[in-house]
Swiss-Prot record:
Induction: Induced by anaerobisis (at protein level). A member of the dormancy regulon. Induced in response to reduced oxygen tension (hypoxia), low levels of nitric oxide (NO) and carbon monoxide (CO). It is hoped that this regulon will give insight into the latent, or dormant phase of infection. Keywords: Coiled coil. The keyword Acyltransferase does not apply. This is Uncharacterized protein Rv2629. One of its GO terms (biological process) is response to hypoxia. GO terms for cellular component: cytosol; peptidoglycan-based cell wall; plasma membrane. SUPFAM superfamilies: L30e-like. The lineage of its organism: Bacteria, Bacillati, Actinomycetota, Actinomycetes, Mycobacteriales. InterPro entries: Bact_RF_family2 (IPR040701), Ribosomal_eL30-like_sf (IPR029064). Residues 39-66 form a coiled coil. The keyword Protein biosynthesis does not apply.
Length: 374
């Protein structure tokens, strides 16, 4: 998960309430179940002496949120000042999670976030395209109607002008493909989408792909979704594109796992594992990707700054800082990673780093732990 969108959490002052719950809307009693869930959440927060304004802001977010479609979860992160995260999850969490802490708890977001990178969906035919740009919660739509005409070849074989008509048709198709290709190229250059989905009949997709410049064509994922005029709704577009995003997510985790194992194996200094090494790398701003495994109830200590994390008090004292707080590792380490702009990846049991946490590093530091002691 890219952490840029969560960067503003670092500037917020706690305590934070982090709540993840089943927000599915697939039964007749969905509204009643949501109300019951919220009552349980409220009771738990009250038992932890959460401030009333924090509870009120969460309650308002729950009651005013748009209902989910089908089986979904919901993530809420709030302080007494504002709701910082309020979004659906791709599925319900295994159980309701409620945290009240100096840190926001973001680990379930890594697993279940619905938010996608910027992408484009284009439904094309030989007359033009319907193009949508997705950036976070914003959707920008453009209809491209090419000026080339006609785009259908005659079926009458004996017509004297068939050759000229065929040439005119092919030229019209090329003009319209060029208009769509030019628009997609401008979108890619301006918005930098991670993927450009192209749907439509095979010939329309093939002709467009051959017209696109290479820097755009490499981002294209073709979808077999029928003709442009089928006019897919947002839920259908979501379902059609989900497989590609799932594939990319799996490929990302696979790549991280392979790179981590390779760097650990060769002792390059470009990977770290275990609480001591990862905390040191986070303090140095050296973490490119944080790998979060099963941290359980593990804790770390921090100095005055919430991002000054160490495995224990002795390591912190070597930095000349007293212990200001003891924090859960699964809260403090992702928070520190967000602060340095690192990506967050969940270990799916393929990596199993020491102490349940690992990292890919931006640069190799010789004897990092020893240098902090000297």
């Amino acid at each position: 998960m890219r952490s840029e969108r969560l960067r503003w959490l670092v500037a917020a002052e706690g305590p934070f309430a982090s709540v993840y719950f089943d927000d599915s809307h697939d039964t007749l009693d969905a509204v009643e179940r949501r109300e019951a869930t919220w009552r349980d959440v409220r009771k738990h927060l009250e038992s932890r002496d959460a401030k009333q304004e924090l509870i009120d802001s969460l309650e308002e977010a729950v009651r005013d949120s748009r209902p989910a479609v089908g089986q979904r979860g919901r993530a809420l992160i709030a302080t007494g000042e504002q709701v910082l995260v309020n979004e659906h999850l791709i599925g319900p969490p295994p159980a309701t999670v409620i945290r009240l802490s100096d840190y926001p708890y973001v680990v379930p977001l890594i697993d279940l976030e619905m938010r996608r990178p910027t992408y484009v969906f284009a439904a094309v035919d030989h007359t033009g395209a319907d193009v949508k740009l997705y950036q976070g919660a914003t959707i920008s739509s453009t209809k491209i109607d090419g000026v080339g005409y006609p785009v259908h070849k005659p079926v009458t074989a004996g017509w004297n002008g068939y050759g000229d008509f065929q040439h005119t048709t092919e030229e019209a198709i090329r003009m319209n493909c060029r208009a769509v290709a030019d628009h997609l190229t401008r979108l890619v250059d301006a918005a930098d989408p991670e993927v450009v989905f192209v749907s439509g009949e095979v010939r329309s997709r093939t002709d467009l792909l051959s017209t696109l410049p290479q820097r755009v064509a490499v981002r294209v994922s073709q979808l077999h979704a029928g003709p442009r005029k089928s006019a897919l709704d947002e839920e259908e577009i979501w379902d059609l594109t989900s497989a590609e995003f799932t594939r990319r997510r799996y490929a990302e985790i696979t790549n991280v796992a392979q790179q981590f194992e390779a760097e650990i194996g060769r002792g390059s200094g470009l990977a770290a594992q275990g609480l001591a090494e990862v905390c040191a790398a986070l303090r140095d701003g050296d973490v490119d990707t944080l790998i979060v495994g099963e941290l359980g109830e593990a804790t770390v200590v921090t100095g005055k700054a919430r991002t000054t994390v160490a495995r224990d008090a002795d390591m912190l004292s070597e930095l000349g800082e007293p212990v200001d707080r003891v924090a859960r590792a699964d809260e403090a380490l992702p928070f520190a990673a967000i602060a340095v702009g690192a990506a967050l990846v969940r270990d799916d049991n393929r990596i199993a780093p020491l102490d349940g946490v690992g990292a890919l590093l931006r640069y190799a530091a010789t004897n990092r732990l020893g240098s902090h002691r000297s």
